[in-house]
Regions:
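Glycine-rich, aromatic-bearing surface loops/beta-hairpins
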Residues: 104-184
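Ordered, amphipathic secondary-structure segments that act as subunit-interaction surfaces
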Residues: 86-110
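Long, hydrophobic N-terminal alpha-helical segment
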Residues: 20-71
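C-terminal catalytic "cap/lid" subdomain
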Residues: 32, 67, 86-87, 146-149
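Structural motif
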Residues: 44-47, 62-63, 88-92, 123-124, ...
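Positively charged n-region of N-terminal signal peptides that target proteins for export
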Residues: 1-6
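Bacterial N-terminal signal peptides
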Residues: 7-18
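Feature captures the catalytic cores and cofactor-binding loops of soluble hydro-lyases/lyases
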Residues: 54-55, 63-89, 109-126
Length: 184
């Protein structure tokens, strides 16, 4: 076992390295996200998570707690994304959310309405929670994920924003592949 005089400095260094997320910088999380967005691109994720969402150990996932509700945080994130020309979000929602009963989770109905209003006009996809988590885990092995944790205490309300290219789409890619003589 190494002497404590070697372990303690290493532990302090490791803990301080984990706090380097620019999202926690002065100016608040919104200023930090505004600073990060130009560096992000397609395949990056921004997750707006409920309060029970676990702190993940993957080095590609940066977590910050901002408080507030899912809907108000989502609106702020989407407003910042709308200012970007290089990316556009694809919102992934848990399919389970639509089946959660008000009796089991008081407030879920209003939360659904608030999230739907925040996502009006957005590209929204649904999938089973574990399928979205697998997609996020795979992505975080190669690409950064920003996880914004709220104070929401309702199940299956996390919104997973998968960033896509803002100036290119599937149709254009298909035409390019056809011009190159590639088939699927």
């Amino acid at each position: 076992m190494p002497p404590i005089r070697l372990v303690l400095p290493a532990l302090c260094l490791a803990l301080s390295a984990g706090c380097s997320c620019p999202m926690a910088a002065s100016g608040g999380w919104e200023a930090g996200l505004r600073q990060e967005l130009p560096r992000m691109g397609h395949r990056n994720f921004i997750v707006i998570a409920d309060s029970a969402y676990p702190l993940q150990s993957s080095p590609g996932i940066k977590t910050i707690h901002v408080g507030g509700t899912q809907a108000e945080t989502l609106k702020k994130v989407l407003a910042l994304l709308a200012q970007q020309k290089h990316v556009r979000p694809i919102a992934w929602m848990d399919a389970e959310q639509s089946k959660v009963a008000e009796a089991d989770a008081p407030g879920i109905g209003q939360c659904r309405k608030d999230l739907a209003a925040a996502l009006a006009g957005a590209n929204v996809q649904t999938a089973a929670h574990m399928d979205i988590i697998k997609k996020l885990d795979e992505s975080s092995k190669l690409f950064n994920v920003i996880l914004i944790k709220t104070d929401e205490t309702l199940p299956y309300t996390s919104v997973f924003l998968e960033l896509d290219c803002g100036y290119w789409n599937g149709e254009k890619e298909a035409r390019l592949r056809a011009a190159l003589g590639e088939t699927k």
